[in-house]
Amino acid sequence: MAPEISIVIPLHDEEDNVEPLVQELTGVMRSVGRPYEVILIDDGSADATFATLRRLQAADSHLRVIQFERNFGQTAAFAAGFAHAQGALIVTLDGDLQNDPADIPRLLDVVRTHDIVCGWRRHRQDAFLTRHVPSVAANWLLGLVSGIRLHDNGCSLKVFRAAVVKPLKLAPGMHRYLPALASQLGNRVAEVVVNHRPRRSGRSKYGLSRTIGVLRDIIGLRGLMRRAIDPATDASRLYTVKQILEAGAERCR
């Protein structure tokens, strides 16, 4: 049966988090009771993330694994997941267990009357000065530039209608601005408070340099939006796939 829901998860050096994440997702999606797939993108991990994914995928036909040639970044991983997603709805979340899969059913309920539903980490469980404060500033600036006021554009836990995101051509870093772009194109965007958990294992990939990059991107947002919907934009070099693991097949690229 073709999946109705595609769950897209970028992973970079998350060897200790990926198995418990898949276990949580499996329980949640069984309770949802709709056909689904989980697309896990190994974004050039240097640890045992891919080996763990290979083992998990061999035992679960819901899992599809995409391995990149090297680390291309989160936007590239999301873009690959969107390109391979078969469901009419696409759920995105981080692979570090800070997003709570138990929130997915509530977002799926809200998307019945919207095109994108964004998670809002009202009570963030990470560093106040280096993560929370820059996030507040970036969300304020993005609202000023784009006209859409969301509390938490950076939360990866979102649900999209596939018809909204599949046609878009993403530039590096652009995954954060999909709600703003979708709103500009006339789509309905909602925001739902979600749980945010402390990181259990591994280390955060975010730092000051990424915050500066986000602020720079927001200032140039209108240009990014034009590129995303321009038929002449070539997004084919955003990432290179090394291999794909899925039920009954292992393909090298």
Which residues does each predicted region cover?
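N-proximal low-complexity "stem/linker" segments adjacent to membrane-targeting elements
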Residues: 1-27, 34
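Short aromatic/hydrophobic "clamp" motif used to bind/position activated sugar donors
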Residues: 90
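Hydrophobic helical membrane-anchoring modules
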Residues: 1-3, 173-253
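Short beta-strand/loop segment that forms part of the nucleotide-sugar
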Residues: 34-44, 66-68
